[in-house]
Amino acid sequence: GGRALLYYLIPYCAMSVGSFAVVAARERELNRPVTVENLAGFGWERPLLGGGMTVFMLGFAGFPLTGGFVGKFYLFAAAYDRGWIWLIIVGVVATAVSLYYYLGVIRAMYFRPSEELQLAPVAGGSPPRELVLQTAVTAAIAVTVGSFFAVQPLIDAARHATEFLFL
């Protein structure tokens, strides 16, 4: 259980940081808070940030090829090993409900037309900040997808961490 949780924290933290970086970049462009409505067309306007947000939403939902999938799989397997079928049912239902929201963000970014190009010039311009946000998103994408392919080393690290923490 602890090993699965520690593994899941790796992609979950990356997905959280990445999605917040995307929102921060969008708020900076619009000079107002981000809503699903003002994400319309964002995936086409800003392919890196829109693609990143797509990867993060799919990861949160537990789609394959993301660390979110592996993390949920290991968490559900740990619950099954302990006989906590009720927890698996709650997790599956929560995941199904969350799909509506996660896929809604993706739908808005790619399938709702932007009424106008919503990019606004940033007062004073700050390329370094933009570079930092894009770098954070790129790194978070790498961890989200990479944690799917590097499962064993991360599980081994989680095992060592749980042995250290609980012994």
Q: PLM features: what roles do these ranges have?
A:
Residues 1-167:
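Alpha-helical transmembrane segments of multi-pass membrane proteins predominantly involved
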